[in-house]
């Protein structure tokens, strides 16, 4: 057990080194590859049930798997994949640099800030908006600013995912619409594991409300889509997602009784996905959950 706990952070810190400004060349998957760990559900005897089709709960510090359910089944991740977009943007740095909005940035649906071509905004403000309110036009602008085009940025996403071991994933754009992309609960946990270690992203994901000032002077109040943040200070962020194809998706993180955990839920058909997250994370905070190996 101790060997696993010590080794996992080193592996992921090594993975971090592949994600910065220039991602190593890799061979991203265009279809799901064979999953290494067993795909059978793992239900510890005293774990609460989850409605999500796929889920995984990990220790946010060691990467130990504490609970899993169909963790290697490919599913549509919806906007939870914005965590990878945010990670690439954050690692590039210079978040005070200005981004000029292009016409193509404004043609995304359905959640938008209402950005207009020619307007200029700091990367930091656009990044905050995608993590708090899931703004797709801000996401498209950041992707184009990062790599020149959405297609080039998508290539960077897939290379980055492959480099950190998320090899059952394929991303078709920066924001998660439409349903051409896929991932797994385990792969999204690998991405979330690194995002959790990014101080800038951690601060942004903890915000329940932010105010976005448009060039016109108009101010838009952005309320977090992650409803856990208002339930308890124990919960400290991550990302929501929803499409008809994906169902409800949620990546949540928290610190309960000294244990930091990350929970990924994909493919839930219930509006009680936040309640499910609370129950399982509280269960882990009581010291429940034994290691099922590293991610």
Which ranges hold each PLM region?
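Active-site helix/loop module of the DD-peptidase/beta-lactamase fold
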Residues: 102-117, 157-170
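Conserved catalytic neighborhood of penicillin-recognizing serine enzymes
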Residues: 109-140, 222-237
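Short, well-structured active-site flanking segments
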Residues: 91-104, 200-207
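Active-site SXXK
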Residues: 62-63, 76-100, 188
